[in-house]
Amino acid sequence: QNTYHRYVSIGVGTVLGSGAQLDLLSKVEGRLHIARVGEYGLGADTTDFVARNVNGNTIAVLQGTAGSTGDPKTVALTASAVYSNAIELVSRLGLHRTRDTGFSWLPLYHDMGLMFLLAGMTTGIPAYIVPNTAFAAAPFKWMQWLTETKTTVTAAPNFAYDILGRYGKLLRDIDLSHLRVAISGGEPIDADAFDKFLEATAPFGFDRSAAAPAYGMAESACAVTMPAVGEGVHYDEVTVTPPGGGEPIRRRYAILGKPLGGMQVRIVEPNVDVPVIDGRNVGHVEIRGASMMRGYLGDADLGAGEWFSTGDLGYLIGDRLV
């Protein structure tokens, strides 16, 4: 019911898909047209397909947000914003069709999963996509798949690396020497957990320089900052005093790289109590640039060059975000 009402509220008329979730959706009475992939895939008659006339300002993607910090919203992304993020990812990662192979189990309804696929399509590199349920059922299969496909580029949230690092002793018969980029994004990065993954996979050929902790969000199509290829993972080890005082603690925060081309990041004065970090100007992270959304569906558009408040706290080391 919730999925149905969200689709209808943003103007969706047809849902293309397969599996149990589509079966459930088809049982909801209403005006949604359910189209099964098997009926519209290979062998189907597509002679009546009429391509749309689009330009850079045409809305290309409506991306739902999880609503973890408020009510769920729908991000409206233009074709130019999506394309900008894709080509800048290609540039930052140095993707090339004669060298690279991608592998992802991220769902295509998530910004990371979608942009991973689109970045691959932009360059024409082979990309293996498996259901996220396959990873959930057997997380260690991910490493086996990377081995079998000789993947060079993959991506996942922090929790996936955490699982493999925590149970790294179970890793067997894998070869990660082909992997030159492993992106960690979509959620805060646990330095200790990520290091355990790096330690567990090093004997199997994974090079620490391939690790790429990144920052992004649906409102910017996906990626905002990311290290250069080969830069690897680096941490800022600092003393943190909790808001309002308290016992200082030592923490390590992942350095999330420079902004992608066409994007800008700044830190503004916080309007709430924030942790105090010696020598660091902690504040609200704001972003703007070529990959930004037009706005939330149903709300006013972002102004040209307008800074967008992400709701996240952070600081800069030079031009790298933490």
Specify the residue positions occupied by each region the protein language model found:
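Adenylate-forming
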Residues: 19-24, 134, 151-199, 211-220, ...
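Conserved AMP-binding/adenylate-forming
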Residues: 1, 104-107, 182, 189-320
